[in-house]
């Protein structure tokens, strides 16, 4: 009876070790797939952003996205924005401007940000070509990027997407 209990205990131990190994492998694969980063897409975009001044004066078209970390619509749109930014990174700047950072208050006022996400779209010469308010699909974001890069008319988008209202200021 003792041999049977030992054998059963060893099998349970093997199962636990196998489970731990599988979890470790899954975490390793996840980290490798994401470049070793567990940052959210919104954090990755913010980290990759140039300053607005540099982006608007470097001879490349620019998408300025006004966002906030608490904005659910911004977080939902971030994976599509990140993929679009990666596809067009050779020809287009994507700049994130966090409306909660007092540093960007002048830009928030200048571009009359009343809801987020708000995309301000600029030509290579830094002139504003248009604005989009609310969440946009991956297809819409790609169409915007292609039009800016090719200096073609911007696509017609269907109304205002979902937004997060700005908090009241006193």
Residue positions per predicted region:
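Non-catalytic, surface beta->alpha helical segment in thiol-disulfide oxidoreductase systems
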Residues: 115, 120-165
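N-terminal targeting signals for export/organelle localization
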Residues: 1-43, 164-170
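Short, thiol/selenol-centered motifs that function as redox-active sites or metal-ligating centers
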Residues: 70-77, 168-170
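Thiol-based oxidoreductase modules, predominantly thioredoxin-like and allied folds used
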Residues: 89-105, 135
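Typically the conserved alpha-helix immediately C-terminal to a functionally engaged Cys/Sec
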Residues: 75-88
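Short extracytoplasmic/periplasmic juxtamembrane "stem" segments immediately C-terminal to an N-terminal membrane anchor
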Residues: 42-60
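Short active-site neighborhood of thiol/selenol oxidoreductases, capturing the structured segment around
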Residues: 56-71
């Amino acid at each position: 009876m003792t041999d049977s209990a030992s054998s059963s205990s060893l099998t349970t131990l093997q199962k636990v070790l196998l489970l731990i190994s599988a979890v470790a492998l899954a975490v390793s694969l996840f980290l490798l797939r994401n470049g070793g980063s567990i940052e959210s897409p919104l954090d990755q975009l913010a980290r990759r952003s140039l300053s607005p001044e540099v982006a608007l004066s470097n001879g490349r078209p620019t998408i300025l996205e006004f966002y906030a970390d608490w904005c659910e619509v911004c977080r939902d749109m971030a994976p599509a924005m990140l993929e679009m930014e990666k596809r067009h990174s050779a020809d287009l700047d994507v700049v994130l401007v966090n409306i909660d950072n007092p540093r960007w208050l002048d830009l928030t006022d200048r571009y009359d940000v009343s809801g987020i996400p708000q995309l301000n779209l600029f030509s290579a010469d830094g002139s504003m070509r248009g604005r989009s308010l609310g969440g946009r699909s991956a297809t819409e974001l790609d169409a915007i990027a292609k039009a800016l890069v090719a200096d073609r008319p911007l696509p017609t988008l269907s109304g205002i997407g979902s937004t997060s209202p700005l908090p009241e200021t006193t």
